[in-house]
């Protein structure tokens, strides 16, 4: 069976995307991947209203590095962001999407991470859970979902200009 997304696109200085879909899958990760020309070693993202530079090993594969001893958490190529992440001159501004991943020459933004248990004791990336397992069935985000983001070609030093295009400043 084939599934499709409807993607609305508009172009100004940024290309704006709005993706609407009906999520019927539990415990699933939805991402949009941006394939860049080179392996992604460095990203710049907005965190706490400033730009953070992060270094990555683009060839790191968590599945090949799962911890064998208790109390160890596997390194990951996922990172948080507020509204912006960029690499190699590509900038992505999101509305409420706060996680991205680096792997090889791709920069992926998480559209939806549907989960049913927080601190799942069966998570292979953690040999010891972060806390007691908590069931959160609504975190599966079943049903209609909308993800919005904008993409442009700009340097990290210009990110505020482009963030303002998506989130105009309000003067009181």
Write out the residue ranges for each language-model feature.
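C-terminal (or distal) subdomains of carbohydrate-active enzymes
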Residues: 1-172
């Amino acid at each position: 069976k084939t599934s499709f997304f409807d993607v609305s696109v508009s172009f100004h200085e940024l290309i704006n995307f709005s993706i609407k879909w009906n999520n019927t899958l539990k415990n699933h990760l939805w991402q949009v991947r941006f394939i860049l020309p080179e392996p992604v070693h460095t990203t710049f993202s907005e965190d706490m209203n400033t730009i953070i530079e992060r270094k990555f090993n683009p060839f790191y594969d968590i599945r090949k590095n799962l911890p064998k001893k208790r109390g160890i958490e596997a390194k990951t190529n996922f990172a948080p962001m507020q509204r912006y992440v960029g690499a190699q001159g590509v900038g992505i501004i999101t509305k409420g999407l706060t996680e991205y991943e680096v792997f090889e020459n791709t920069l992926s933004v998480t559209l939806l991470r549907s989960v049913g248990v927080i601190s799942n004791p069966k998570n292979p990336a953690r040999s010891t859970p972060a806390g007691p397992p908590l069931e959160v069935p609504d975190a599966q985000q079943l049903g209609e979902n909308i993800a919005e983001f904008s993409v442009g070609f700009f340097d990290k030093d210009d990110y505020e200009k482009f963030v303002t295009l998506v989130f105009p400043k309000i003067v009181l």
